[in-house]
Amino acid sequence: MEKTIYHGSDHIIEKPKFGYGKPYNDYGIGFYCTQNPNMAKEWGVGIDHNGYANRYEIECDGLTILDLNAPGYTMLHWLTILLENREFDTSAPLAAEAKEYLMNTFHLDYKSADIIIGYRAEDSYFSFASDFINGAISYRQLCNAMRLGKLGQQFVLKSKAAFEQLEFLGYETADSKEWYKKKAFRDQTARRQYLDVERNRRQRGDLYITTILDEEMKPDDPRLR
């Protein structure tokens, strides 16, 4: 099964290097792509520089794909991977306890996957996750918040085997004046919707991290689906 994917960057990348990148990205070191060319253009531009949506084709047959949106996983599986790779402020006792419990209970062997598909935690979305482990929002609110702004999914190449199946097809240029404005608007929209619609809209019966900890909830709990 072949898929077309895009990588947003400030330069053209004909041959991505395996093992190159920042270890503190959402899923650790990897080549971060999307199946949406417009999203790649937003990711590639900066306020003062143009960008590129590098286009590739990848043959997925024979590769192990961890799709965090599949029915067998919950938002807490995604959050646990994020906690392992990103720097969260867990100085508060609740956040520290939440991190420890999630790491012990919802940890996945994601490093053995060739490809990971899941949410991208840009600044706004990272703050949503932080609010959850600090008890400021419920699990329902977290799940809803991750869909604000329609950020979409990342398609991340993690293994050498995945890199070997990648073929460069070309690139599309992204003008900073056009695409940075769209990028900023998407982020601002997500923040505004979060504050207006989600953060202060508690519902009776909402599930908070304190309940998850107190009841020692497990991944198969139907309340997490």
Feature-to-residue mapping (PLM):
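Extended catalytic/binding region for NAD+/ADP-ribose chemistry, centered on the ART fold
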Residues: 22-47
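Short, flexible loop/turn elements at secondary-structure junctions
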Residues: 10-11, 37, 60-62
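A broad, low-specificity signal marking well-ordered, structured residues that form hydrophobic/aromatic
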Residues: 4, 31, 53-54, 154-155
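Compositionally biased, low-complexity linear motifs
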Residues: 42-58
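Conserved NAD+-utilizing ADP-ribose enzyme module
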Residues: 47-49, 60-225
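ADP-ribose/NAD+-binding catalytic cleft of ART/PARP-like enzymes
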Residues: 1-26, 46, 54, 219-225
